[in-house]
Swiss-Prot record:
<dbReference type="InterPro" id="IPR027417">
    <property type="entry name" value="P-loop_NTPase"/>
</dbReference>
<dbReference type="GO" id="GO:0008270">
    <property type="term" value="F:zinc ion binding"/>
</dbReference>
<dbReference type="GO" id="GO:0071897">
    <property type="term" value="P:DNA biosynthetic process"/>
</dbReference>
<feature type="binding site">
    <location>
        <position position="186"/>
    </location>
    <ligand>
        <name>Zn(2+)</name>
    </ligand>
</feature>
<feature type="binding site">
    <location>
        <begin position="15"/>
        <end position="22"/>
    </location>
    <ligand>
        <name>ATP</name>
    </ligand>
</feature>
<keyword id="KW-0067">ATP-binding</keyword>
<feature type="binding site">
    <location>
        <begin position="88"/>
        <end position="91"/>
    </location>
    <ligand>
        <name>ATP</name>
    </ligand>
</feature>
<dbReference type="GO" id="GO:0005524">
    <property type="term" value="F:ATP binding"/>
</dbReference>
<keyword id="KW-0237">DNA synthesis</keyword>
<feature type="active site" description="Proton acceptor">
    <location>
        <position position="89"/>
    </location>
</feature>
<keyword id="KW-0479">Metal-binding</keyword>
<feature type="binding site">
    <location>
        <position position="23"/>
    </location>
    <ligand>
        <name>ATP</name>
    </ligand>
</feature>
<feature type="binding site">
    <location>
        <position position="145"/>
    </location>
    <ligand>
        <name>Zn(2+)</name>
    </ligand>
</feature>
<dbReference type="GO" id="GO:0005829">
    <property type="term" value="C:cytosol"/>
</dbReference>
<protein>
    <recommendedName>
        <fullName>Thymidine kinase</fullName>
        <ecNumber>2.7.1.21</ecNumber>
    </recommendedName>
</protein>
<dbReference type="InterPro" id="IPR001267">
    <property type="entry name" value="Thymidine_kinase"/>
</dbReference>
<feature type="binding site">
    <location>
        <position position="148"/>
    </location>
    <ligand>
        <name>Zn(2+)</name>
    </ligand>
</feature>
Length: 195
């Protein structure tokens, strides 16, 4: 894939849970390190499933990160000689993240964002649609549906082993005890509002 050398850009990695988004983000961070680029990694403070200080994939791969409360804190921690900014679980940030990512890219940096493109209801998640719109590069990766084995593009939330209702809170931090990857056909949302 062509990468501009004379200006910044935005990369967005999206997909359902268990598709390897954080793993891909970590891979890109490690490649930037091999290229001897200065990198800063951020994650939302709310994501403390595996670690408070690291971006961690479900496979156990990890990279050190700064956990922040809101997107504006990225600017507080931003170091002028940084060449690459990586942000995991970007869907949990406020809408201002789009403006901040754009500002950093316009200053000549590479910005890599990873996150869920849809919430458990199958609806666009937080600032992700806007980030995808401004990005130069978007990778939508799939998981495997745990029900039928087909490619999965959705995240199924489970509460006591049953699909969560449409009106349940959108944000619930969890892992395998609360979520599964599902395909369109096997994704179930009780009481979903029909068009």
């Amino acid at each position: 894939m062509y990468r501009p050398k004379d200006h910044g850009w935005v990369e967005v990695i999206v997909g359902p849970m268990y598709s390897g988004k954080s793993e891909e983000l970590i891979r890109r961070i490690r490649r930037a390190k091999i290229a001897k680029q200065k990198i800063q990694v951020f994650k939302p403070e709310i994501d403390n499933r595996y670690s408070k200080e690291d971006v961690v994939s479900h496979m156990g791969e990890k990279e050190q990160a700064v956990a922040i409360k809101n997107s504006r804190e990225i600017l507080k921690y931003f170091e002028e000689d940084t060449e690459v900014i990586a942000i995991d679980e970007v869907q949990f940030f406020d809408d201002e993240i789009v403006e901040i990512v754009n500002k950093i890219a316009e200053s000549g940096r590479r910005v890599i964002c990873a996150g869920l493109d849809m919430d458990f209801r199958g609806k666009p998640f937080g600032p992700i649609p806007e980030l995808m719109a401004i990005a130069e590069f978007v990778d939508k990766i799939q998981a495997i549906c745990v029900v039928c084995g087909n490619p999965a593009t959705r995240t199924q939330r489970l509460i006591n082993g049953k699909p969560a209702f449409y009106d349940d809170p959108v944000v619930l931090i969890g892992a395998m005890e609360s979520y599964e990857a599902r395909c369109r056909k096997c994704h179930v949302v009780p009481q979903k509002k029909e068009v």
